[in-house]
Amino acid sequence: MRSRGSDTEGSAQKKFPRHTKGHSFQGPKNMKHRQQDKDSPSESDVILPCPKAEKPHSGNGHQAEDLSRDDLLFLLSILEGELQARDEVIGILKAEKMDLALLEAQYGFVTPKKVLEALQRDAFQAKSTPWQEDIYEKPMNELDKVVEKHKESYRRILGQLLVAEKSRRQTILELEEEKRKHKEYMEKSDEFICLLEQECERLKKLIDQEIKSQEEKEQEKEKRVTTLKEELTKLKSFALMVVDEQQRLTAQLTLQRQKIQELTTNAKETHTKLALAEARVQEEEQKATRLEKELQTQTTKFHQDQDTIMAKLTNEDSQNRQLQQKLAALSRQIDELEETNRSLRKAEEELQDIKEKISKGEYGNAGIMAEVEELRKRVLDMEGKDEELIKMEEQCRDLNKRLERETLQSKDFKLEVEKLSKRIMALEKLEDAFNKSKQECYSLKCNLEKERMTTKQLSQELESLKVRIKELEAIESRLEKTEFTLKEDLTKLKTLTVMFVDERKTMSEKLKKTEDKLQAASSQLQVEQNKVTTVTEKLIEETKRALKSKTDVEEKMYSVTKERDDLKNKLKAEEEKGNDLLSRVNMLKNRLQSLEAIEKDFLKNKLNQDSGKSTTALHQENNKIKELSQEVERLKLKLKDMKAIEDDLMKTEDEYETLERRYANERDKAQFLSKELEHVKMELAKYKLAEKTETSHEQWLFKRLQEEEAKSGHLSREVDALKEKIHEYMATEDLICHLQGDHSVLQKKLNQQENRNRDLGREIENLTKELERYRHFSKSLRPSLNGRRISDPQVFSKEVQTEAVDNEPPDYKSLIPLERAVINGQLYEESENQDEDPNDEGSVLSFKCSQSTPCPVNRKLWIPWMKSKEGHLQNGKMQTKPNANFVQPGDLVLSHTPGQPLHIKVTPDHVQNTATLEITSPTTESPHSYTSTAVIPNCGTPKQRITILQNASITPVKSKTSTEDLMNLEQGMSPITMATFARAQTPESCGSLTPERTMSPIQVLAVTGSASSPEQGRSPEPTEISAKHAIFRVSPDRQSSWQFQRSNSNSSSVITTEDNKIHIHLGSPYMQAVASPVRPASPSAPLQDNRTQGLINGALNKTTNKVTSSITITPTATPLPRQSQITVEPLLLPH
């Protein structure tokens, strides 16, 4: 049957991803394909390729060339979708052609034809391997095998049930026989029932507490539900806020679209302006070419003029040299003439000195007039130079005016450039806002996709919850069946519990499997979510890249426009430099012409003045020569300046060439940018179309959102209902678990009762044997020395010794007397049947029966006593209340090597009603030898102690019992310890002893009490007992044979038996009693009310006037070579 389930699951898994692919890749195309599948395959083959064929033929060749890459991708996606649809139609047709019988044989179950055809279609699409054999054969063979195995297991179970029923019938017969023989012991079961009722009450209280805790949990869950509802309302409000934001964003988008349209119009205007600017640039280029040609012509002229000037300068230099030679000759002549003039003047001075007195004023006026004439000539020369300076100043003023005009034009251009930059910044801001709106739209899309994914997850969780509910219903039905069987078989069958445990294990395994499946599904969902997030991140990165490319293009455009403006400015500056150079060249030409005119005038004057030169002419010529030399130096400086200007012109030509190259590159860039602008415009048009489609898509998404919100509301309600059902199922499971726990506890108790019954049967046989031996022994001992007759005692003290935990002896000093009496669920009982005879001496003989069967429960029941021991011990001391009427027992622990006998000597003192006890080891040479004496009081006040005088190196250890701790013992007790108390008080538990147990300590226990009536024994108040019973338990090695010895000293009878049981009778000759022994439950009053009845066989008899004491020493064998411990316990018994 597993093959069918696996096939169906596999087919479902195969089908599911193909549908998801179709939904994710092609949304509206799947609807078309479904309609075509409904009609006929032939129509789908004919209709689908028609629009494809019409598209390329409808347009011209230019349209086919204009198709962009996105259009081609779109067409390819359409082609792929149509091919997938064709494949699906082929698969459907193949699946329809298959025979039903073959499909049923393949998949192994009978279902409607459509389901099988769908599975076959998925198999064709997945290209799975075809089947080879019929699936019906293997499951039938496996079913036959399973049926045979079930039959065999059924037979085995029936055999086990028959064996169990037979054993149960035998036990019932044995129990009925034992009930007939021992009706007295059945009375004690009432106490056990009372304890069980108490346990039931306690369990009921626990159930009430659990119910309260469950109610609190339900309240907490209700609070959680309310918080979840509040969160749902918040989410709904958040969804409404999202819708409002979407509407607001759509309004912003419309505004942004308007802005984009305005920007496009502005861009068109700028394009027209750019075209005009390009035309102007072309005109300027033509002007620049013209200017270049003019510059070339002017440079050629300048070079020619320069050559002529250089030739003239060389001629002038030669003339100047000749003139200088002439001047040198003239200067020599002038020197000679001056010397002659000096001599003449000296002579004339002598003559004139005489004439000065007559004609002083006339001669002085003539010299002054000559000097005035010379000064006038110099002024005229200076005026000619001033006119030249005035002309230069006028030219400078013209240049300054031109510069001011050009600066004004440059300022206007700068203002226009700033306006253009402001417009570009505004356009960039608008584009940034548009990009932000795009990003917000993408985020909204992502949010919608996330909400889709959440709805899908919720639907998947609903499906998983439904599957869980089905499984829980199946579990509930099975659990109801198990409850019914449990109620029927709680008291009868033990084997069915194993079956129930197995079923529970299988159910837990199934639940684990389902949880694992859910975890796997959740992991797959997380993987798919991660994939979706990665895809969305990739889309976001692509959009960011597109935006970055756009911004880069815009920055390039901006940089290109800046560079163009800079080039324009540079061209204007260079034009200004050219104009300056032209003006300088004109100035130089004018200067050269003026120099040539001056030279001509100079030559003419020279020729005219050659004939008659005077001293004054010579001076004038000298001055002219000086001026000419100065002008020549000035011309040289001007030539140097012209050379520098020529160098500058060459540099400007190089720069012009580089600028031309840059201009060509910028033209290419501008063409490339224009192409990119056209591409961007195309993308903007496409984007507008996409926005139009997105608005319709957003409306559709909004509708889908509303539908999904309604679905999520329904899903949340269903989830709440499912949660309530799950809580109910959990409550039923808890109740079933409690019932199973109670069933296991009751089964354990039944096992314990059966073990007790077996032990009882064995113990009864042992008791009958011991009774016969005791009667025989008492008959042999009846004639005593004093003429008294020993009564037949019926003291049978059963003393149980537990297996020590971790092979260590238990510390009996810390145990309470009741705990000593009830160790490992067994009761130590002591019963005496004493016959009164005033003529015989009172010596009591008591046997101790230590044979028992091993019980495995003893080990389990030892643990609570250990726990109680830890709770009661504090520093080895136990405190008592001062008002208690009981003696605090003092314990003495004596070490003794096993396998060696002990010598005990008892000397009674009837005057003081005491007896001294001496316990000695016979070998004083060994290191473990010792002697100890104890004084045991027979009667007196109720508060008495046993004093032990030690003769060896043995320290007495005292411990005090605490009534307060014992009062608190019942509060800290577990139900197991209470069950052990109850079982310990029943007569069936009187001797389950393991023969291979370890050594037990010898205890000294002193308890006082008096029993005047049975009512007092049953009353909760402490009963004072007027006699003492000292019990010595010694643990040497095991001895199998019986030895009868008797030693009498000072009217005391000491009897040793075969298994080293020494019975010492201490009593006054006037007092003897016949009563059943009392073993008090504890030295505290509150614990005695319920347990004295279980410890006393019947009512307490009324006391007589005789008081006796008996000391019983019981040896128990130890297989391990350990030292034994001796503890003395005196017990007060009523007589």
Swiss-Prot record:
Induction, as annotated: Up-regulated in endothelial cells with the angiogenesis inhibitors endostatin and fumagillin. By endothelial monocyte-activating polypeptide II in endothelial cells.
GO BP annotations listed: protein localization to actin cytoskeleton
Coiled coil: 164-782
Known tissue expression: Expressed in endothelial cells, colon and colon cancers. In the colon, expressed in the vasculature and muscularis mucosa. In colon cancer, strongly expressed in tumor stroma and the vasculature (at protein level). Expressed in ovarian epithelial cells. Down-regulated in ovarian cancer.
GO terms for cellular component: actin cytoskeleton; cytoplasm; membrane; nucleus
Pfam families: CortBP2
Keyword tags: Coiled coil, Cytoplasm, Membrane, Nucleus, Phosphoprotein
Entry-annotated residues carrying Phosphothreonine: T986, T994
Phosphoserine modification, residue list: S791, S1052
Localization of this protein: Cytoplasm; Membrane; Nucleus
Compositional bias segments (type: Basic and acidic residues): 52-65
Location of the region described as Disordered in the Swiss-Prot/TrEMBL record: 1-65
Family, similarity comment: Belongs to the FILIP1 family.
Physiological role: Acts as a regulator of the antiangiogenic activity on endothelial cells. When overexpressed in endothelial cells, leads to inhibition of cell proliferation and migration and an increase in apoptosis. Inhibits melanoma growth When expressed in tumor-associated vasculature.
Protein name (database record): Filamin A-interacting protein 1-like
